[in-house]
């Protein structure tokens, strides 16, 4: 057994890191050594057993005599190997290592330095402003990184997040008050997101952020008896309070300004600027091409850019598979791509989860279309049986005071169709605003005649084969809806004990989460013997038909063949012996109610027990004696409890953790009821679906979901497909009555008396044949019920293409290429499409399934209207005020109490509303968030960063068009002319890599890889490097070099915009239309222009990349030195010292680029062995090149020396204090281990700072 030794101190951050890692290891694949999870020990290990003196915490012992590991980093890695982010050397793994190191060396010293003195755990002679400045400098890289990232390495917590969060626990608990947290907004958002994850909460509990009122003393650990304080201690505390008040005053000042010498982050400046609203006002009739002949606006405006393009695309037929070919059946060597949309419910509007689905599907569709494939993305909408009926019923009651029963079936259905026509277009409007390249001429609604015919055909065929059948079984029943509901429509509410819940139809709340015990008297017992049973649903005891005990339970062996007496009914209940009973739970005896519990039903089947239903469809009691007859079920609960007490049979009540099933539409408590329903036999179809994945005929990605697929298919149950609703596909089955005395009347559960038919005439002929009578003796009554919505949805890939008719679309596009959807409906929708498709056509409906993660809010919470975190994509596109968000809640169906709760949630998450981000930024951001995990914690505010990216594209293209000039003519091909400069070759090489990564990522459904490649190319390579190096070339006298640069620049724009187009269709179309064309016959729109292929862009150039890598390394070093010496407005000369002639030649070749990129003066390469000029600061660019930056004459050496000497004295004093503190008697024993580690890290940091100061002093002394 392995043991994890940790500190009991509540703020021991190294131990907390290990404990959280252990939690993640439990939830994942387990510890790195493959053994059992370790036991936790809240004390140091015995020194006699550890290989490292003194004992350090956390420490991990892998069994007696096994491997010992100590230290937070090593222990956490071993407990949670998956937290490393991937295999060594991968991008994620490198990022994890980087941030873990940063947390250990930068965050922990800064956090302790800022927090411990304030808590009185360490004295500090430093100015509190300087202490907070050090913390601010440590937080700055985090703040900038987290501006565009949810977590430090990927889209889920890793060991990097564990290390950084635990390092910052002290500041967030005791130092960073609300004003400070607003300064570090991104860090705060990330910190709160992390500590709300279940694994963090299990260890940390509820993390309370510092409110501004700090305790005067900090109690680190269990409370101890207070000792009398001496006069000296009281005097010392008074001084502490005085210093604390001064510290807090200075802290408030500090929080309003950046740390000394530090600039405000540029993104903050950009976010504070009001970009204004620029609109496109030229008169353009819908469907006509947008006029882009005028000048480009000064800055990017989503409303300007997105205007007019979509109607033109639609009018031109770019989204139709017929575009560019005579018909869809025409042979296409590039292949066919077909995908159908997961049909959204017609009930309302799309949210950000739908927007994620849409962004992924449209980017894939546009990529396939640009590759020249015959492409169809088919739109559609689902009638959403229960959801729609509930919404319209509420509307009807609110506006007319009528129920659907008062209105009647036909009139009610007319109201639903009317509502559908009024509201149904909103979803399609949203989809179009999202840029969805759907073929709208093929749009379908699941209640359309074409799709309804397919539903009827499927039901009739399956019924004729015996796959669909009629049976009486237990179903999930909503008494409020008066209908059976599917498993996906049942929410599971977990209770820890006694809880009062609101139930529709009851004025008072109902008690749940308790276990009631009562006694059944044994029949014929002379000793008044009884059997005690317990239940959470005491009202169901009126339906009890037996008591069950385990066959091996010795306590009840003497009761074999005996009965117990029901106290309220004239029947005795047999005592049955069944192995399902848990002997160790309660008394080991269980009441059996087959008509109201699934386990009891199965016991009843095994023992031939009667199933007595005691509730009608509305939840009122039936088949019971007065006074219980007719009582609502939860009124009966109280009445039964009173009656048991009156008869002396009540034995107790206790809290009981339980799960209450709730209907997610009506919020009613779901009851298991016996009802005759229609079922689908799924066994053989499930085996075929499972085998298709095993053989590889059907690929499910990510592959981790295949295990879930097989588990569901191997354990599938019969599918109940009937619903007691009016809105939906009415079941094409008819109950038969035969007007012939020779034929006895039938009963509902008897399947022989039910026939199906495509119409009533066909059903009548079937019935006449079945009973051997003439059709005129047959009376038919069609079933009032409708089919489960998932049944018609399961036929969607077939029905939209015209099945069962052999249409042209069916022959070309079935089976489809891909089904893309969220992993949460893998069983409810995907599995049923596969089963029905295979059964009805003998072919799979699609060849691949890609399952994306589920969108949650920035705090990891499920999207819920009552939390106020359900966001309309259009509100992100256009922006909305906080009041606007509130107004949406007022117009919803939420209860007033839920509205107030949702308002608070909106106020917390969007205090200033949601800024206008635009469609392109939203789509790109959602795809960038994608990871092959199960959840995405989406921070809407992060989308704004991608609007800034759009602005960068805009400005870069605007600059490029000026550089190209009005008379520029692109060369006929994109191939280089042979006279390109080093930086021209480099950017082409980087463009080649972006093209390779983009195509590779699309093929692998690795959307973050695609977005990262494109973002990096445009922002970090084209804008930050190439355009800067281009400026002197375009303004120079070398016309050959300038022309080569212009052709290369044009190629970068042309290829770069095509790369981005699937994600950002609007801004790329706008910019593309402003570029000159290589050929007059080029496609009219970017969306039908060929996507860049590696074969087209094969310009990989390792030599140029090595040269520019040296240039960029030198540039980074020069920029760092300029920042150190505050030379932001001066262009200092730079001298490069190289180790060999090859490096010298390379440095000489890139010196001009360094001059442009680093804003340097002269950039010269020193001869081998030549000394650098006096008065230079030195930095390393690589192991073969050093930079000497000329400071002589640019700074005042005497003044700088004075500042450095003072800094040196303070650093020496601080180092000496730390050495004395660590050398003090009892330090290893009395001081907490985490404080010792922080002191050690602080000493190392201070000594490194001293060495740097000494080097600077030596430099400036030479300059005097």
From Swiss-Prot:
Tell me the enzyme class. Answer: ligase
Q: Where is this region: Disordered?
A: 217-296
Listed as disulfide-bonded, the cysteine pairs are none
Q: Which residues carry this modification: Phosphoserine?
A: 437, 527
In this record, what's one Pfam family?
GST_C
Motif mapping: 'KMSKS' region: 862-866
The GST C-terminal domain sits at 89-219
How is this chain's activity regulated? Can be regulated by protein kinase C-dependent phosphorylation.
Q: Which CDD domains match?
A: Anticodon_Ia_Val, GST_C_ValRS_N, ValRS_core
What GO cellular-component annotations does this UniProt entry give?
cytosol; endoplasmic reticulum
One of the GO biological process terms: valyl-tRNA aminoacylation
Could you tell me what reaction this enzyme catalyses? tRNA(Val) + L-valine + ATP = L-valyl-tRNA(Val) + AMP + diphosphate
- Binding positions (ATP): 865
For molecular function, the Gene Ontology terms on record are:
aminoacyl-tRNA deacylase activity; ATP binding; valine-tRNA ligase activity
In which residues does the motif 'HIGH' region occur? 344-354
Q: Which UniProt keywords apply?
A: Acetylation, Aminoacyl-tRNA synthetase, ATP-binding, Disease variant, Epilepsy, Intellectual disability, Ligase, Nucleotide-binding, Phosphoprotein, Protein biosynthesis
User: For bias kind Basic and acidic residues, which ranges apply?
Assistant: 234-248, 261-275
Positions carrying N6-acetyllysine are 645
Report the residues modified as N-acetylserine: 2
What's the stated role of this polypeptide? Catalyzes the attachment of valine to tRNA(Val).
Q: Which disease is it linked to?
A: Neurodevelopmental disorder with microcephaly, seizures, and cortical atrophy: An autosomal recessive neurodevelopmental disorder characterized by severe developmental delay, intellectual disability, severe microcephaly, and cortical atrophy.
Q: Which family does it belong to?
A: Belongs to the class-I aminoacyl-tRNA synthetase family.
This one is known as Valine--tRNA ligase
Species name: Homo sapiens
